Amino acid sequence: MAICRILGIDPGSRITGYGIIDVRGTAIDYVDSGCIRLATQLMPQRLMTIHQGIFELVQQYHPQQFAIEAIFVHKNPNSALKLGQARGVAICAAVLSGLSINEYAAKSIKQAVVGKGGADKIQVQHMVKILLNRQGAIQSDAADALAVAITHAHHLQTLACQRPRQTDYWVNGNAS
C-alpha cells in the first residue's frame, strides 16, 4: 500500500507550526513536527523566514500533500493582515514546490481531531498525542499543524472510501 506524506501548517506571524505525517490506508504515523520561530524581525524578514522554512521542509521530507489552516475572522484587523501574509508566503512556498493547497477551517480541524468544533488548544494537543501515539510534549503550534495534517488525512481516507472499487464495475453487470 502506498504511503502519502502530508505537511500540515499552522501559520502565524510570530510562530509558524509544522507537522509531517505519513498515511498508509487508515494508519497515520508521526514523522516530524516543530516551529519556525520568527523572533523580532521586521515583517518582510519574517515572511522570508517562513517561505524559506517551508521550502526547506518540502526539500527535506518530500511531502505529496500540503494542508494549511484557513483564514478566520480576527478581532484585531492588523493581526488578521499579518496572519494573511504569513499564510500567503507559506502557500507560495508550497505552490512553488509543486504541491496543491488544501485548506481547512479551525472548526473543521477541531471536529476532525477532537470530535467537537469548539475544542480548546489543550484538547487538540491531547488528541494529537493520542492519535499519533506520542509520549512527549508537543509544542502548541506544532500540535495545531499536526492536527491540520490529520484532518487532511481523514479527508483523503473519506475520498478513498467514496471511490467505487474496480470490482464493483464487474459485479454490477457492466462487463460486456
Swiss-Prot record:
Gene3D superfamilies found in the cross-reference section: Ribonuclease H-like superfamily/Ribonuclease H
The EC number on file is 3.1.21.10
The entry's cellular-component GO terms read: cytoplasm; Holliday junction resolvase complex
Q: Which GO terms describe its molecular function?
A: crossover junction DNA endonuclease activity; DNA binding; magnesium ion binding
Q: Which residues bind Mg(2+) 1?
A: D10, D141
Q: Which UniProt keywords apply?
A: Cytoplasm, DNA damage, DNA recombination, DNA repair, DNA-binding, Endonuclease, Hydrolase, Magnesium, Metal-binding, Nuclease
Amino-acid positions noted as binding Mg(2+) 2 in the UniProt annotation, renumbered to this chain: E69
Q: Return the SUPFAM superfamilies for the record.
A: Ribonuclease H-like
The free-text cofactor remark is: Binds 2 Mg(2+) ion per subunit.
| Locations listed in the record | Cytoplasm
Q: Which cofactors are required for activity?
A: Mg(2+)
The family database entries (CDD domains) matched by this protein are listed as:
RuvC (cd16962)
Q: How does it assemble?
A: Homodimer which binds Holliday junction (HJ) DNA. The HJ becomes 2-fold symmetrical on binding to RuvC with unstacked arms; it has a different conformation from HJ DNA in complex with RuvA. In the full resolvosome a probable DNA-RuvA(4)-RuvB(12)-RuvC(2) complex forms which resolves the HJ.
The record's comment on protein family reads: Belongs to the RuvC family.
- Give the protein's function: The RuvA-RuvB-RuvC complex processes Holliday junction (HJ) DNA during genetic recombination and DNA repair. Endonuclease that resolves HJ intermediates. Cleaves cruciform DNA by making single-stranded nicks across the HJ at symmetrical positions within the homologous arms, yielding a 5'-phosphate and a 3'-hydroxyl group; requires a central core of homology in the junction. The consensus cleavage sequence is 5'-(A/T)TT(C/G)-3'. Cleavage occurs on the 3'-side of the TT dinucleotide at the point of strand exchange.
What is the protein's name according to its record?
Crossover junction endodeoxyribonuclease RuvC
Please name the taxonomic classification of the source. Answer: Bacteria, Pseudomonadati, Pseudomonadota, Gammaproteobacteria, Cardiobacteriales
